[in-house]
């Protein structure tokens, strides 16, 4: 990770989550942004639940200070455990795994499989291009603009918590359109 801001903000977020009395449920890694978040949580004696597939045991990637460590057989099962146990999803800067997890919880929400807040933590404008790509998908007719209401974007740690605390639940049909008539589809 080239810019320290991603590590520093993740560690701060972890501390803040712990100080709120909330738990972090994550992929159990000790490296990168999520490793920094984990260190922030444990520095404040917070609850840190790691979920990892069995094959991670041999790769020396697991954070050893999780308050609970859950092992699964597959990556798919891992995501399912995290999705089921989470009350909200905060999407920090990350790579392909983060993108995949974001789009999975977004799709599940569109299909009314959960009604939990999804907050994209856009540190340093990291997700600006992805947000613009999604807007392009709307303007080109590939998805409804209602899909952009499935998640919120926070630029600061304070905004992350405000958006979770003030979450307004929308109800969508199976195609991602708002059921309350507040859509263009």
Could you tell me what each predicted segment is?
Residues 77-112, 119, 170-178:
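Active-site/ligand-binding-proximal alpha/beta "capping" segment
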Residues 2-85, 125-157, 168-185:
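A cross-family phosphate/adenosyl-ligand binding-site feature
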Residues 92-93, 117-121, 148-151:
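Flexible, glycine/proline-enriched loop segments at strand-loop-helix junctions
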Residues 164:
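Hydrophobic "lid"/C-terminal helical patch
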């Amino acid at each position: 990770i080239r810019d320290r801001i991603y590590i520093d903000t993740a560690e701060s977020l972890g501390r803040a989550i712990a100080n709120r009395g909330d738990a972090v449920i994550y992929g159990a890694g000790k490296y990168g942004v999520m490793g920094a978040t984990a260190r922030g949580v444990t520095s404040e004696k917070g609850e840190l639940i790691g979920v990892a597939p069995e094959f991670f045991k041999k790769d020396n990637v697991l954070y050893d200070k999780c308050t609970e460590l859950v092992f699964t057989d597959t990556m798919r099962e891992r995501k399912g455990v995290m999705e089921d146990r989470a009350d909200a999803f905060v999407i920090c800067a990350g790579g392909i795994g983060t993108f995949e997890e974001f789009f999975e919880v977004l799709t599940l929400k569109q299909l009314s499989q959960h009604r939990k807040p999804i907050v994209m933590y856009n540190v340093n404008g990291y997700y600006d291009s992805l947000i613009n790509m999604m807007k392009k998908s709307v303007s080109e007719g590939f998805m409804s603009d209602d899909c952009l209401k499935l998640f919120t974007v926070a630029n600061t740690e304070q905004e992350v918590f405000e958006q979770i605390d003030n979450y307004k639940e929308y109800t969508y049909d199976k195609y991602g359109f708002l059921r309350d008539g507040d859509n263009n589809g």
